């Protein structure tokens, strides 16, 4: 993730995700490079079922694959005035914290640390013991562009 005065640019690969929130609302999330994401895109399953799909861990693009290094997907968004929050997390995190809960916790938080702590509490209450695949980092950025 790279932020400058009026845009965010990121690269992503596999099933770790980047979520972008503006003023407490989810405005973008990366699409996984997984068999279950293809099933969502083809209309075979709803997005709400991706967490439970039998093929959710089958990736067609990931770091560490044998052979040629796959190219990451690169995206960017223009940043409007407001508070922008970014959550970068592994599948072991987003599988246990719903997007609606991410929004709720963000809207109630007074800091990035508090937001991450609230989501981590949800994860710890739901994840099986020994789940160690749950890395996450959050970034808050307030954008205030001068009007011409």
Where are these regions (language model features)?
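Short, acidic Gly/Pro/Ser/Thr-rich loop/turn segments
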Residues: 8, 17-18, 36, 95, ...
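A short, polar/proline- and glycine-enriched secondary-structure boundary/capping micro-motif
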Residues: 20-25, 38-41, 99
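Conserved, helical-rich catalytic subdomain that frames metal- and/or nucleotide-binding sites
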Residues: 31-84
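C-terminal catalytic subdomain
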Residues: 61-89, 93-148
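A generic hydrophobic-helix recognition signal that picks specific residues
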Residues: 7-8, 36, 84, 126
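Conserved catalytic micro-motifs used in adenylation/nucleotidyl-transfer and phosphoryl/amide-
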Residues: 1-22, 28
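ATP/adenylate-binding site constellation spanning eukaryotic-like Ser/Thr protein kinases
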Residues: 13-15, 23, 56, 90, ...
């Amino acid at each position: 993730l790279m932020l400058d005065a009026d845009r965010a640019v990121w690269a992503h690969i596999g099933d770790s995700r980047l979520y972008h929130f503006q003023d407490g609302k989810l405005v973008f999330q990366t699409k996984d490079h997984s068999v279950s994401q293809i099933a969502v895109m083809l209309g075979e399953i709803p997005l709400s079922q991706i967490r439970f799909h039998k093929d959710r861990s089958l990736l067609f693009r990931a770091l560490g694959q044998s052979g040629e290094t796959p190219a990451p997907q690169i995206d960017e968004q223009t940043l409007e005035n407001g508070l922008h929050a970014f959550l970068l997390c592994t599948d072991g995190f987003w599988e246990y914290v719903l997007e609606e809960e991410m929004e709720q916790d963000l809207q109630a938080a007074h800091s990035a640390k508090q937001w991450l702590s609230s989501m981590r509490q949800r994860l710890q209450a739901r994840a099986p013991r020994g789940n160690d695949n749950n890395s996450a980092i959050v970034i808050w950025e307030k954008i205030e562009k001068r009007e011409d």
